[in-house]
Amino acid sequence: MMSSVSTESKLQQAVSLKGVDPETCMIVFKNHWAQVVKILEKHDPLKNTQAKYGSIPPDEASAVQNYVEHMLFLLIEEQAKDAAMGPILEFVVCENIMEKLFLWSLRREFTDETKLEQLKMYEMLVTQSYQPLLHHKPILKPLMMLLSSCSGTATPAVEGKLVVLLNQLCSILAKDPSILELFFHTSEDQGAANFLIFSLLIPFIHREGTVGQQARDALLFIMSLSAENSMVANHIVENTYFCPVLATGLSGLYSSLPTKLEEKGEDWHCILKDDWLLLPALVQFMNSLEFCNAVIQVAHPLIRTQLVSYIYNGFLVPVLAPALHKVTVEEVMTTTAYLDLFLRSISEPALLEIFLRFILLHRHENVHILDTLTSRINTPFRLCVVSLALFRTLIGLHCEDVMLQLVLRYLVPCNHMMLSQRWAVKERDCYSVSAAKLLALTPVCCASGITLTLGNQERDYILWSKCMHDGSGSEEQLLPETPCSPSSPSPPPPPAPAACIVEYGKALDISYLQYLWEAHTNILHCMRDCRVWSALYDGDSPDPETFLQSLSEESRENSGHPEARLPQQSVRTSGQTKDKSQSELEWDDSYDTGISSGADVGSPGPDDEVETPAPPAPIDPPKHIQEMKKNAILLFKGSYIEESDFQDDVMVYRLCAEKDTEDTTEPQKDTSEPQGDTLEPLEDTSEQQEDTSEQLEDTSELQEDTAEPQGDTADPTAEAQPKLQPEAQSLPTSNGPLSSPDPETESQPSRESSDLCQNTFSEAKPENEPGVALALDSELIATTFEAEPQSELAVVSTESEDFIAQYDQIIQELDSGTEGLTEQSIPISEPSLLTQQEERREECKEEEDDDFDSLMAATPAVEAGSSPFGVGEDTAFSSRHPVRTQSTPFTGPFISVVLSKLENMLENSLHVNLLLIGIITQLASYPQPLLRSFLLNTNMVFQPSVRSLYQVLASVKNKIEQFASVERDFPGLLIQAQQYLLFRVDMSDMAPAALTKDPIQEISRPESDKTLLDGPPRVLQPFLGNRAKVTRAPPNLPLPVKNTMLAAALFPEFLKELAALAQEHSILCYKILGDFEDSCC
């Protein structure tokens, strides 16, 4: 009937009734209606017994159509004065014309064509009329009847026109909420779904194409309306399936996503908008996820709460959690990439919160999702790169909950540092000592050649020049520069040899100035986001003691609620059973929070006076944790993995201290056979043999590295050890002889780090040794001295010499073919070295025994750990200082695995290294003093079992130098690697402002994602971009050599980036979080 309405209305829009007499229009309207009524009554069975259903002559149907078209035009163009109805509209309402026309359509064959005519007619009325027609029930009721009759249709044309009309109606409702009550009352006859418009839109929520988009837009109008109208909100929550359909629809759409993605090249590490726009199934899912985000943003709190609950319990837990644990690596990698994409696409905090809750708190098969994701960083597949990209996204959120679970919860107790170092957490490095030490790690073999700068900086680049400060005799030392303006006045003379000063007029590294600017921007951006955090995390807030208690209480409260339980809070017992292997003990300990209520509980020692609660029952580590441990051994043999204590030489000394406690509490055991408790667990599994041999290898490596710089002797390792031990033992008790590296540390005589670091700079080198060699070795000495002296101090046992010798003998017998690092093999410690250690310790035994109690009080965290070898059921470590109970020092699995991966920098692929660098610089940009001091303060003295970023960087430096010493064409290969990295960036794709913004975010992220994840900008990161243009082929080298050279090219830039962050923190750390707006540009 109304097939030509749309076309003719466009032609009639040019005709205006302005100036025409309203009475004339009314007369015309009534005449047309009279003609229509004659035809309607003729075919009305109630008034004409001869009328037949559906048999209407075409000419009469066409006549009705023409009359109705003119009538609608007159009604639409009528303009009423004031609030009164116009005469035509009043006539339509009184005569119930719209309902009669609808019944006329029903008498005919109610085909899809008839429905289309009716839908078009109402679309014209509601969109073009000057009067509010929907306020009148005689017009609204037939409209609702028409919509109801179209609800079950499956014709695309009718569905499209129906959604268009519904969209228009919702738009009118949003503008004029007074109509809303009429819709509810009018649709009371429609059953449970008495808000018919809303109910009709629900089936189209997840529809693809224009129809789905228009339906979602219409629903958003109603969602915004619900925020101000609790009646609508209550109806949607109680009487509709909107939230369940939305959440379960996500599950259905996710099941249709590809389980494996196409190969995108070695650069691929995350899904970008350009990628998912090519996948229709992913486009459909992202549209629905974006709609969920929009609904939560504008809807009533009741709807928001119900929706996030359904998404969590209807999509994340039953669908995404199992998908993250698929069998094949490709499926797991794809799911991880999807999760990263979802996080980058969500902007509404309530929706983001449940995704983060899922990652941080949910347990799948008794293993936390966060543990699973962390373990995958240690995989050799592309899954590692995708997992790193996910963590980059998480850290870039600047979310307190994320950082608390990843890092801060392990740093808050402050048991990773020496007790005397607490004051240094908030220390301000005014003289850039940390930056100087970081820059001094630059290998000499990498100091020449080009530097990685962006293309438009290349012409202006000035080669980095080192300052040689002439000292007395042969104490010439290579020092890095501190950027400052060449035109500025000459700086004052250095306060100590360790100061970092640039000479007046020296050339500066342009790229370093860029790093400084980026660091300044990153830190301010992070400070702005952290203003809302609940604590400063500065060692005092939150209070370490109350934090320990709160987590212990929370662990007990949440023990019966797996969903709300915090991750990595598996309760660890100090007394482990004898039949539990060492590998299980180590890995189980690694996933302890370090602050659970039973961490320090066990058989009381002789000095324990305070009663402690009984420990909970032991919990066997899940298979997943055991697999993580095996992967760590297989993939990173010989490298640093903190949580497994692979290189922790103080492990042996802890066992000796434990033996003292065991001998006191269990005198019936024969102390003359100290190896008895360790033989059984050592023989349990072959994996354990690998573990213990690794520990001995790393101990040997540390001893060799420490001994190298001490002199030119035939056997420097053997001769240096007796010289180092007395110095190490005297450090904590004698602060006077060593001068402080700068005025700030001179005013802190009790600071152990000053002694340890100054020992490196003030020690004179032999005259026949090159100055460059001293500069290289000095950093290694600083690294090893920060861990070794405290390890030596922890050796307090009358049986320790015997035990160490027998332990060494056992390991050498069990595993004689231990492999070393990829680039070097580390020999087992010679018995002669241990013999010399024993002799030296015999001489100092009395003094050590006298000082035992004081030393253990100063380092309380060392005593509270269970033995890594396994002990008797009734034997455990007990605190020597019960007033301050501490757990085994541990910085958390995430930090541990990231540092272990970084230490293998030379073996990693380029993309792994770039992501690792990005994550570490993200972490180093946080203003929280605990995190800042742990990563960037090179003078901090940590517990012997805790390895710092500075020590890992020193290890990487040594590996690079060792490789350079055996690679004849190292300088040429280095230049090739640097050029290859430079040409990876296509500067034509970058905006000029990209140098002051995050290159990864600006290049890689779609426009819709940039509002949420504004991660810290990094100069190095353009080399990682998916659009990086490789204009030159990489050097044609074997893969291990290629990876090593690319890592050697990145390493100096990484050091400059960290040094710049350290310097900028020294400027900005005095600012209160929130008092920095004036510094933002």
Swiss-Prot record:
Bias-annotated ranges (Pro residues): 486-496
Bias-annotated ranges (Acidic residues): 680-707
Ranges of Basic and acidic residues composition bias in the record: 553-564
Bias kind Polar residues: ranges: 567-576, 727-738, 746-762
Listed GO biological process terms: protein localization to perinuclear region of cytoplasm
Location of region: Disordered: 474-496, 544-623, 658-770, 863-883
Subunit and interaction comment: May be a component of the FTS/Hook/FHIP complex (FHF complex), composed of AKTIP/FTS, FHIP1B, and one or more members of the Hook family of proteins HOOK1, HOOK2, and HOOK3. May interact directly with AKTIP/FTS.
Function: Probable component of the FTS/Hook/FHIP complex (FHF complex). FHF complex promotes the distribution of AP-4 complex to the perinuclear area of the cell.
Family of this protein: Belongs to the FHIP family.
UniProt-recorded name of the protein: FHF complex subunit HOOK-interacting protein 1A
Organism from which the protein derives: Mus musculus (Mouse)
Gene name as annotated: Fhip1a
